[in-house]
């Protein structure tokens, strides 16, 4: 089984930057995308945009050469999650995610659903603890350990299930690399260049700090999408990361 994404339009990038597309308007999103270069980043499409504009929007981004992280955080019974992940793979996305709190059977089913896709399978990542969550939020759910402890517990379960990595906060990255190894990919939201506002992400870090901490892919949103010159902003961040590599 192979994905439907066109390999001829895909442009390979070695940038760790994933730009979060958080737009309410399709035309505005595409106008932004047409200002940037797929060699400088990948793109993340989340629940709102995918619900509004559907798979065809993902295809339009792919036709422009971009790798897509489909950030839908599947969390369901194992069979349903597996079918959803397979549908994402058939769409040809570069990365897809599930909630680790869905449990081992769900994550294993999702991983096994990607086996028929072979080398065309997307990276399968699990969400540990959302970056907006604090200890008090977890306590409301009956979780008495800290966000960092809970994230590490879920990351360990994710690795046991054979997934490619986790979404985690940058503060957890150093420990996770030590605990789970270099091949276990770390995807981190809440990354903001120096001087950017924190927004609704509580646990934040600069791109240079994230790279030094062991983050493999860093999700950056408004500091790029709201920049007066997003193409130059991306080039500046990439250059700063190469300088720290």
Swiss-Prot record:
Name of the molecule in the record: Orotidine 5'-phosphate decarboxylase
A Pfam family recorded for this sequence: OMPdecase
GO CC annotations on file: cytosol
One of the GO biological process terms: 'de novo' UMP biosynthetic process
Catalytic activity field: orotidine 5'-phosphate + H(+) = UMP + CO2
CDD domains for the chain: OMP_decarboxylase_like
Pathway the protein takes part in: Pyrimidine metabolism; UMP biosynthesis via de novo pathway; UMP from orotate: step 2/2
Native species: Escherichia fergusonii (strain ATCC 35469 / DSM 13698 / CCUG 18766 / IAM 14443 / JCM 21226 / LMG 7866 / NBRC 102419 / NCTC 12128 / CDC 0568-73)
Family membership noted in the UniProt record: Belongs to the OMP decarboxylase family. Type 1 subfamily.
């Amino acid at each position: 089984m192979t994905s439907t994404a066109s390999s001829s339009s895909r442009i390979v990038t070695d940038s760790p930057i994933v730009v979060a597309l958080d737009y309410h308007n399709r035309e505005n999103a595409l106008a932004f995308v047409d200002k940037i270069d797929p060699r400088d980043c990948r793109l993340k499409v989340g629940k709102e945009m995918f619900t509004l504009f559907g798979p065809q929007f993902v295809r339009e981004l792919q036709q422009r050469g971009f790798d897509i992280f489909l950030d839908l955080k599947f969390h369901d019974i194992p069979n349903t999650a597996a079918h959803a992940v397979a549908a994402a793979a058939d769409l040809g996305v570069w990365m897809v995610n599930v909630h680790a709190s869905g449990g081992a059977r769900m994550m294993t089913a999702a991983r096994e659903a990607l086996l028929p896709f072979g080398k065309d399978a997307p990276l399968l990542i699990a969400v540990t603890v959302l970056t907006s969550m604090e200890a008090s939020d977890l306590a409301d759910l009956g979780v008495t350990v800290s966000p960092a402890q809970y994230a590490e517990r879920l990351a360990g379960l994710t690795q046991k299930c054979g997934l490619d990595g986790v979404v985690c906060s940058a503060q957890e990255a150093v420990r996770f690399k030590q605990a789970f190894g270099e091949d276990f990919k770390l995807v981190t939201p809440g990354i903001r260049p120096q001087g950017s506002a924190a927004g609704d992400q509580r646990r934040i870090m600069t791109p240079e700090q994230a790279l030094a901490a062991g983050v493999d892919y860093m999700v950056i949103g408004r500091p790029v999408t709201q920049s007066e010159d997003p193409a130059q902003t991306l080039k500046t961040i990439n250059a700063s990361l190469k300088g720290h590599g």
